[in-house]
Amino acid sequence: MITGLLKKVFGSRNERLIKQYRRTVEQINALEPKFEQLSDDQLRGMTETFRQRHAGGESLESLLPEAFAVCREASKRIMKMRHFDVQLIGGMVLNDNKIAEMRTGEGKTLTATLAVYLNAITGKGVHVVTVNDYLAQRDAEWMGRLYNYLGLSVGVNLSQMAHDQKQAAYNADITYGTNNEFGFDYLRDNMVYDPSQRVQRPLNYAIVDEVDSILIDEARTPLIISGQAENHTDLYQRMNGIPRLLERQIGEEKADGTGVEKPGDYYVDEKGHQVYLTEAGHEKAEEILAQQGLIGEGESLYAPQNITLMHHLYAALRAHSLFHRDQHYVVQNDEVVIVDEFTGRLMTGRRWSDGLHQAVEAKEGVSIQQENQTLATITFQNYFRMYTKLAGMTGTADTEAYEFQEIYGLEVVVIPTNRAAQRKDLQDQIYKTSKERYDAVVRDIRDCYDRGQPVLVGTTSIETSEYLSDLLNKEKLPHQVLNAKQHEREAEIVAQAGRPKMITIATNMAGRGTDIVLGGNVEKQAGFVEIDPNLSDADKAARIQQLKDEWQSLHEQVKSFGGLHIVGTERHESRRIDNQLRGRAGRQGDPGSSRFYLSLDDQLLRIFAGDRVRAIMERLKMPEGEPIEAGIVTRSIESAQRKVEGRNFDIRKQLLQYDDVANDQRKEIYKLRNDVLEANDVGEMVKNLRESVLIELFREHVAADTMEEQWDIAGLETRLREDWGLELPLAKTIEGAQSIEDEALLDMILKAAEERYEGKVAMVGRESFAGFERSVMLQSIDSHWREHLAALDHLRQGIHLRGYAQKDPKQEYKRESFELFARLLDVIKNEVTRVTFNVQIQSPEELEQASEQIEEGLSHLENVQYKHDEFAEGREPVEDAPSLRTGAAVAAEMAVAGMPKVGRNDPCPCGSGKKFKQCHGKLS
């Protein structure tokens, strides 16, 4: 109440910001007549003038009014589009490192040109980030005309581009590309063996289009570059038969022993997206595995040697229970292809980690591809936070404003619309069963079709869109289906969706980024006419003119029918995705309407709000086929959505807290790697490492501040001779001297090592040896960093169990990952020293050959894959398979291997007081 009163008096923060921006808009508008008087050459010349003024110390903020006015004038001349005042406000919001929330159809692409132009003046590069290659290329070509006119270069960064094309794209003033490609290029740049092979410049300024999709929906899973690990194909096939031999338990056992409706061998937790074996299930699984010869008779699944089997069994159970064909994936050309939960698009080439993809392949009977080893990884949170300036724009960000502020430090500013919105959002209708819901949807579509009103139907899966398509075919209602299977025709279908009597079924936000214009998108239709090879130029011109003439009458006709009608067949977990669907109607002040049809069978209602809504329906004694349409029910659903959003935010925040630990280590390793790459001579680095290793060796045998009698000189001589080839008479030196300091002995060792090393360098020349040293250092850093990533994954998977021992898992993860990192640096130091010190080289040619072999072994990895995996429901972060048994990973498993053999009902040896099966026995 007090907050509401304060807002009435002072206005909300959003209103106050808009008020401030409007003052600058007045300045820009006042400059318009001045720039209208300039010739094209004079207007173009303003860019160079701005550059000189900025180089002279003038800030971008002081240049902003003039730069925006110049950009608007250029747009009027080249694009025949004048920025509205609200678009100028949007441009200022983007320049101020904020997120501009602009309604669909308000011209986000044109708005971005203002902030892009201003920031490109610095010459440090501006990245415009989009969700797919099509939008990146479209916007680069479309807006590139404006930037080129103003004397700025534009590049587009697409996947599968050649190296020199990528370098040219990044060296341009403005670079368009996808979030995945920018992130992968960063990782690849930190895997090169020559600084000239890098493509990115330092990260300066990024504007992220559809910022909610990229920084929130896709932020739960990291970008991963991986290579193939050892083959477990046969094991996946054998494990695939086991879920069919196990019974599913209905209901979860509660603390008091109730809750189980039907006992079984495993329980599916839909909320947590996990599968758990019951007590009976463990025993049955052990019997089956023993019969198959995979474990010994009477042996436990939890024996350390069976950890890998446990992992494969759970992967098979999840594949059968949680991942469904045509909903989470499709099968095409002997491959399992993931369906993006948020857009409904096929994600060709992407694979689930943790052995899950292979388990699904075994289930579907397609060829099983090998598991992967992580070579490099980063989350979007940590990648985008490296930019000096970051901004974003979307139609729906306000519901996630807290997360943007908390994680990225980005404030959301809601930009007023140019024209008042006229869309009517009708109340949800909830039915008892799915069949009743779809009958109502078809009735609504039929009603709109008979009146001539276009309809866009939003579904949450390919399966639903195809089921609805079958229903409409039975009703003889003509329609278009837009889902992952048809995305090649996406632009064409969306262009037609606003025409009279058009019925379009779309999975979630397929076609996002393309406007649905009432009467049809005449620009898009004209584009298809332009590329028709069967028409002459004269025919094309005539057809385009005809389309333009027809469009105006169609536009008015559709407006009179009520504009575009949106039908949602299910509520999404996130209110934001629902708002995106609604936002397709009522663009730029056009009329429109929207309604969601739900049933008690829907996952969201079933898991989070089903009991409450069902109780209301029973209390009201609703007859079959009659819906509830009440504010209390809609509020219950929104409350359920808020719960899920909060839960997903916690998951993303937790992922970030864990990844921040790895990110600090990643920065250190990449800095070390770049220092090695860029150093003129790494000899000094190698010398420091060598001295450090020898000092540690010396102190193992001669502790500081000890007497001569306590020194292990014989042991030291042996280690120096066997490990380092140094024959030093240390014992004789001590005997021959009346008294000797330990530091004098150490100096003697370091000097002897230095002389031997320099003798080796002299044989082939300093320059040749420096190249070899660089290759050895890079090889050691890269190979051990990969092992370290696998070790961190292993640590991460089991760290939650520390909670049972009353320890904070995050603190334990930080502590142990730091210990692993210290060990990593130690291993690199020792390996580099040993290889460079003991290498037997006779000629520069041999040395060069050795360097090339090292570099080739690491830079030409087989079957390298680039993944940004998205689990179904986007609920969980990707982790690589625990079966990767690199040296560091095995070290991380030692704790498990060291656990005594314990019965499942015995107290857990960790000291938590729980039974083993409810504590560390839960390890999967």
UniProtKB/Swiss-Prot annotation:
It is found in: Cell inner membrane; Cytoplasm. The keyword Transferase does not apply. Its EC number is 7.4.2.8. It catalyses: ATP + H2O + cellular proteinSide 1 = ADP + phosphate + cellular proteinSide 2. GO terms for molecular function: ATP binding; metal ion binding; protein-exporting ATPase activity. Its cofactor is Zn(2+). It holds the Pfam family SEC-C. ATP binds at residues 87, 105-109, 515. It is a peripheral membrane protein. Zn(2+) binds at residues 908, 910, 919-920. One of its GO terms (cellular component) is plasma membrane. It is an enzyme of class 7 (translocase). Keywords: ATP-binding, Cell inner membrane, Cell membrane, Cytoplasm, Membrane, Metal-binding, Nucleotide-binding, Protein transport, Translocase, Translocation, Transport, Zinc. GO terms for biological process: intracellular protein transmembrane transport; protein import; protein targeting; protein transport by the Sec complex. May bind 1 zinc ion per subunit. Part of the Sec protein translocase complex. Interacts with the SecYEG preprotein conducting channel. Has a central role in coupling the hydrolysis of ATP to the transfer of proteins into and across the cell membrane, serving both as a receptor for the preprotein-SecB complex and as an ATP-driven molecular motor driving the stepwise translocation of polypeptide chains across the membrane. Belongs to the SecA family. Monomer and homodimer. Part of the essential Sec protein translocation apparatus which comprises SecA, SecYEG and auxiliary proteins SecDF-YajC and YidC. This is Protein translocase subunit SecA. It comes from Cupriavidus pinatubonensis (strain JMP 134 / LMG 1197). The gene is secA.
